[in-house]
């Protein structure tokens, strides 16, 4: 019998209910799951407004509003009938110890991937993507990155733990190939010398969804893909509850259509990050994040059903 709040040897802790009311499994490595959801309640690398540590709980809470819909529009099937998805709760680490969080998250991810599972992770600030990339690169080799964000997170400020430096560090460690990676929705300062293809928010909003998706597919090719979605990619009208909001972003409708268009890519890992519910209004940011996460699972289910 599992006890709520009990810490297990695998450094996970239970939650009252799983994302989308999916089954909780606190020993996911030995399960028959295809995809495992992990919450990472960490916001010590935040440069703006803190509070992302509460993101996983907010995403799970609001996801109950989505749980009732089995044949989700516009899909003609129930994702849960094609994918075995479990929620293993949140990573446990000594609060205040960013290095321990990073090491434990990487170890957890490596163990899941070695067991043949795939991961959907909830942040937390965007720094959590770096240890996840390290684990995925060990298993899949160098990857392409598909990155939705208002910021490129390629800043070289010398900080070890900073949610704006991961995609400066990751190419230098050989985790991702910038020449096959794309950043979508950017509308802040960026350095073109980093090698990423940047599709800024202005052009993504002006171009057709099909046109943008075609370019993403051409850039990525057949490489294994890590998909990361910082919720501040959305305009603050649709996602006010985040640490570093920037006006002029994507609508939630356009973001969902873009995610659906990634179905044919070889996506090996996914995350949704930077939900800070203290700044949210009527849970709309958490709902956007939960819906995008659900769409990510649907594109995996659609591909499996082909």
Curated annotation (Swiss-Prot):
One of its GO terms (biological process) is spermidine biosynthetic process. Keywords: Hydrolase, Manganese, Metal-binding, Polyamine biosynthesis, Putrescine biosynthesis, Spermidine biosynthesis. Its EC number is 3.5.3.11. One of its GO terms (molecular function) is manganese ion binding. Pathway: Amine and polyamine biosynthesis; putrescine biosynthesis via agmatine pathway; putrescine from agmatine: step 1/1. Its cofactor is Mn(2+). It holds the Pfam family Arginase. InterPro entries: Agmatinase, Agmatinase-rel, Ureohydrolase, Ureohydrolase_dom_sf, Ureohydrolase_Mn_BS. CDD domains: Agmatinase_PAH. Mn(2+) binds at residues 126, 149, 151, 153, 230, 232. It catalyses: agmatine + H2O = urea + putrescine. Gene3D superfamilies: Ureohydrolase domain. HAMAP family: SpeB. Catalyzes the formation of putrescine from agmatine. NCBIfam families: agmatinase, PRK02190.1. Belongs to the arginase family. Agmatinase subfamily. This is Agmatinase. It comes from Escherichia coli (strain 55989 / EAEC).
């Amino acid at each position: 019998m599992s006890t709520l709040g009990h810490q297990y040897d695998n450094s996970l802790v239970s939650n009252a209910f799983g994302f989308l009311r999916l089954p909780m499994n606190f020993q996911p490595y030995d399960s028959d799951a295809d995809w495992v959801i992990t919450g990472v309640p960490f916001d010590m690398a935040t440069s703006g407004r803190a509070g992302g540590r509460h993101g996983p709980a907010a995403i799970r809470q609001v996801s109950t509003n989505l749980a009732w819909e089995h044949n989700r529009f516009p899909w003609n099937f129930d994702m849960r009938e094609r994918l075995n998805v479990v929620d293993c709760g949140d990573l446990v680490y000594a609060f205040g110890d960013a290095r321990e969080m990073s090491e434990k998250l990487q170890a957890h991810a490596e163990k899941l991937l070695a067991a043949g599972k795939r991961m959907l992770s909830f942040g937390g600030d965007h720094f959590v993507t770096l240890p996840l990339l390290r684990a995925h690169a060990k298993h899949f080799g160098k990857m392409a990155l598909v990155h939705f964000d208002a910021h490129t997170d390629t800043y070289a400020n010398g900080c070890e733990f900073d949610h704006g430096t991961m995609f400066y560090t990751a190419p230098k460690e050989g985790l991702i190939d910038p020449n096959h990676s794309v950043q979508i929705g950017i509308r802040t300062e960026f350095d073109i010398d980093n090698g990423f293809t940047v599709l800024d928010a202005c052009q993504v909003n002006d171009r057709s969804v099909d046109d943008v998706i075609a370019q993403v597919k051409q850039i990525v090719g057949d490489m294994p893909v890590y998909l990361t979605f910082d919720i501040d990619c959305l305009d603050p009208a649709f996602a006010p509850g985040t640490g570093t909001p920037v006006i002029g972003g994507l609508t939630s409708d356009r973001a969902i259509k873009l995610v659906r268009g990634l179905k044919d890519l070889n996506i090996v890992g996914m995350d949704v990050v930077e939900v800070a519910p203290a700044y949210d209004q009527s849970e709309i940011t958490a709902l956007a994040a939960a819906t995008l996460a659900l769409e990510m699972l649907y594109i995996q289910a659609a591909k499996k059903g082909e």
